[in-house]
A protein has these predicted regions:
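Non-catalytic signal-transmission and effector/linker regions of two-component phosphorelay proteins
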Residues: 1-5
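Active-site residues of response regulator receiver
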Residues: 10, 57
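Two-component/phosphorelay signaling modules centered on CheY-like receiver
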Residues: 13-34
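Conserved phosphotransfer cores of two-component systems
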Residues: 27, 47-49, 71-79
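Acidic catalytic/metal-coordinating carboxylates
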Residues: 38-41, 64-67
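Active-site beta3 strand of CheY-like receiver
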Residues: 49-55
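Receiver (REC) domain active-site loop signature in two-component systems and cognate sites
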Residues: 60
Length: 84
């Protein structure tokens, strides 16, 4: 079974790690391939890891989730974005 590759983006490490730990990603068809603490960090990870999905917080320092989403849609239109 091919798993969708997902990256989690949130400026609060406890939130990121908690989401990664508490959800059975594989049972839902996902593989967490990375995480990032802000939109700028996420840009590099997205280019390196080529995820299918990015799950991002909306409010973060340096680059917020809306700006990140806009960038993803322009550069990687096939990547789905979930904003929380």
């Amino acid at each position: 079974m091919n798993l969708y590759r997902i990256i989690l983006v949130d400026d609060e490490e406890e939130v990121r790690k908690g989401i990664i730990r508490k959800i059975d990603w594989e049972a839902l068809g996902f593989q967490v391939v990375g995480d990032a603490e802000n939109g700028q960090d996420a840009l590099e990870k997205i280019e390196q890891l080529e995820p299918d999905v990015v799950m991002t917080d909306i409010r973060m320092p340096y680059m917020d989730g809306l700006t990140l989403t806009s960038w993803i849609r322009q550069k990687y239109p096939s990547v789905k974005v979930l904003i929380f």
